[in-house]
Curated annotation (Swiss-Prot):
Family: Belongs to the tubulin family.
GO biological process: microtubule cytoskeleton organization; mitotic cell cycle; nuclear division; nuclear migration by microtubule mediated pushing forces
Function: Tubulin is the major constituent of microtubules, a cylinder consisting of laterally associated linear protofilaments composed of alpha- and beta-tubulin heterodimers. Microtubules grow by the addition of GTP-tubulin dimers to the microtubule end, where a stabilizing cap forms. Below the cap, tubulin dimers are in GDP-bound state, owing to GTPase activity of alpha-tubulin.
Protein name stated in the entry: Tubulin alpha-A chain
Binding-site residues, Mg(2+): 72
Annotated catalytic residues: 255
Length: 454
């Protein structure tokens, strides 16, 4: 028994990401769209441990341990009428009557607060059915109203009720040039401020970076959210694969935290995935372990727009899947460390955590190869790296926040929902000190008296 993981999907981004993630899980476990074992599946018998993600019902159906919540009814209605309507427990699809209107304060204080108790009750129901709960994966965006405001509210409550359990976030972060709402910088700064203390590890994804990966590597001229989400789902799946399948080096949720977060506030790793290649091109490529590992460190394979060559790595987790042996991974890491462009901080000499899982990576089949589906490959690697370069992303966000806040633009919408204006400046100060934390970590720690602690 490896422990269960509960998925919580909040807001439109969380819901759509969740849809792609569960689509992939069903494929990996050999289950049909309504959660029964698929007789035609190639993974029959090797479906791994179902218990981690699914509860088995009395009639042999596997029901996901997941909760979908949105204050706006339409994204949840899409699931209720979509291809997976038979899969999810209807009580665990919760939608409100009015949406958060891209307003953090609505999601956190007014509309969201009314739904909070109901949502926490449902979470309690799911966790009561678990033998040994490992933790939570929370999917949401920092830019929307529900994702930021309600997401922060749910994480605050989880931190109270499940203090010892692991809480990992997958957050869609506002992209540098593409914005879906004018007030994204406000929502993101407020949400980051209120979740900093409550989340153990937050994996950031920005849509622009993933768009570029899809355009460049999969030759999709205009990628849709579905293309983006399927790519992100591959990383989500790798993170939990060793809880579900056997491998040479297993990694559980707590290990991410232990190995990736040197200081509690600095918990925003970058993620990247290789190989991202279309089915039409895959015949011309070799996917050696060492090549895939190097691909992960290319700036244009990373899911947040920032340049890791400008920063230093504090810790890196490499999660391999498929036909990979430990000797190859050690050689790949040694080759990496020898490169001059790879900078580790001085105070963390090893810096690498490796996971190996024997389950081959799978991808959701598309109607035609031209649709930009991922090629089926024998091995893949997901990289989670805590690097000081991600401070670039924070400073971009803070700059946008400052431009609007200097004129107090749009602030009345937040104050009108019962939020105090002081919370804006408090949140902004918190992010300024987060940027400072990254600067200090990147600097040498030689001036700190390390012996004083012992």
């Amino acid at each position: 028994m490896r422990g269960e993981v509960v998925h919580i999907h909040l807001g439109q981004a969380g819901t759509q990401l969740g849809n792609s993630a569960w689509e992939l899980y069903l494929l990996e476990h050999g289950l049909t769209q309504d959660g029964r074992k698929d007789p035609d599946s190639t993974v029959a018998g090797e479906g791994g441990s179902y218990d981690t993600f699914f509860t088995e019902s009395s009639n042999g159906k596997y029901v996901p341990r997941s909760l979908f919540v949105d204050l706006d009814p339409s994204p949840i209605d899409e699931i209720r009428t979509g291809p997976y309507r038979q899969l999810f427990h209807p009580e665990l699809l919760i939608s409100g009557k009015e949406d958060a209107a891209n307003n953090y304060a609505r999601g956190h204080y007014t509309v969201g607060k009314e739904m909070a108790e109901n949502v926490l009750d449902r979470i309690r129901k799911i966790t009561d059915n678990c033998h040994s709960l490992q933790g939570f994966l929370v999917f949401h965006s920092f830019g929307g109203g529900t994702g930021s405001g309600f997401g922060a509210l749910v994480l605050e409550r989880l931190a109270q009720d499940y203090a010892k359990k692991c809480k990992l976030e997958f957050s869609v972060y506002p992209a540098p040039r593409v914005a879906t709402a004018v007030v994204e910088p406000y929502n993101a700064v407020l949400a980051t401020h209120s979740t900093l203390e409550h989340s153990d590890v937050t994996f950031l994804v920005d849509n622009e970076a993933v768009y570029d990966i899809c355009r460049r590597n999969l030759d999709i001229p205009r990628p849709s959210y579905e293309h983006l989400n399927r790519l992100i789902a591959q990383v989500v799946s790798s993170i939990t694969s060793s809880l579900r399948f056997d491998g040479a080096l297993n990694v559980d949720l707590n290990e991410f935290q232990t190995n990736l977060v040197p200081f509690p506030r600095v918990h925003y790793p970058l993620i990247s995935y290789a190989p991202v290649i279309s089915a039409t091109k895959s015949a011309h490529e070799s996917f050696k372990t060492s090549e895939l590992t190097l691909q992960c460190f290319e700036p244009n394979n990373q899911m947040v727009v920032c340049d890791p060559r400008n920063g230093k790595y504090m810790a890196v987790a490499l999660l391999y899947r498929g036909d990979v042996v430990p000797r190859d991974t050690s050689a790949a890491v040694a080759a990496l460390k020898a490169k001059s462009s790879f900078n580790l901080v001085e105070w963390c000499p090893t810096g690498f955590k490796i996971g190996i899982n024997h389950q081959k990576p799978m991808s959701v089949p598309t109607a035609s190869p031209a649709d930009g589906g991922l090629a089926s490959v024998d091995r893949s690697v997901s990289m989670l790296s805590n690097t000081t370069a991600i401070a670039e992303a924070w400073s971009r966000l803070d700059h946008k926040f400052d431009l609007m806040y200097s004129k107090r633009a749009f602030v009345h919408w937040y104050v009108g929902e019962g939020m105090e204006e002081g919370e804006f400046s408090e949140a902004r100060e918190d992010l300024a000190s987060l940027e400072k934390d990254y600067e200090e970590v990147a600097g040498d720690y030689n001036d700190v008296d390390v012996d004083a602690e012992y």
